């Protein structure tokens, strides 16, 4: 599947917020001024308030880029979320959080979602003891995710673990960083996820 391979800082500046596309080795401010619009005139340009549609579109783009998903696949996630019981917006976030690459990232085995996706694609990840190389694979409750033996000494994994130790461990995951494995205990509740995401704007956009 095609992926965006351009400058990640440009995407963050376009959305005006940290999309968590870079590792936490340095602060985002030292790498990318998210308050400045991209382009040669970005330093002097003003971020306009925008229309209702514009705000909805930007929110969709922001979430899509946070999880590293292209438009066609994002629409499929939305369609699936709308067919489930409950809040469509919360269902959408749940589907995104249950992606294998995202769970690998949340467990601290990859310093970014892009790196976690690469670990999955390169067959470095085991799901319940079996190799799964599909980043979009939906993880279920009580599934065990672990690092394949031959990949455990990769420097990028060790660096990611060092960064993970500096942050709070998600409550919906049971992680053993020494054994390089973890269990997906439950689908995270909405209040356990970022409050910066306004999923209702995405629902409004696709409901038009």
Swiss-Prot record:
Family to which this protein belongs: Belongs to the universal ribosomal protein uS4 family.
PROSITE patterns according to UniProt: RIBOSOMAL_S4 (PS00632), S4 (PS50889)
Keywords: Ribonucleoprotein, Ribosomal protein, RNA-binding, rRNA-binding
UniProt-listed GO biological process terms: ribosomal small subunit biogenesis; translation
CDD domains with a match to the protein in the record: S4
Subunit composition and interactions: Part of the 30S ribosomal subunit. Contacts protein S5. The interaction surface between S4 and S5 is involved in control of translational fidelity.
SMART domains referenced in this protein's UniProt entry, alphabetically: Ribosomal_S4, S4
NCBIfam families from the UniProt entry: PRK05327.1, rpsD_bact
Pfam family, one: S4
Known function: One of the primary rRNA binding proteins, it binds directly to 16S rRNA where it nucleates assembly of the body of the 30S subunit. With S5 and S12 plays an important role in translational accuracy.
TM helices/strands, residue ranges: none
Segments forming domain S4 RNA-binding: 98-160
Residue stretches in coiled coil: none
SUPFAM superfamilies: Alpha-L RNA-binding motif (SSF55174)
GO CC terms, sorted: small ribosomal subunit
A GO term for molecular function: rRNA binding
Protein name per UniProt: Small ribosomal subunit protein uS4
InterPro entries: Ribosomal_uS4, Ribosomal_uS4_bac-type, Ribosomal_uS4_CS, Ribosomal_uS4_N, S4_RNA-bd, S4_RNA-bd_sf
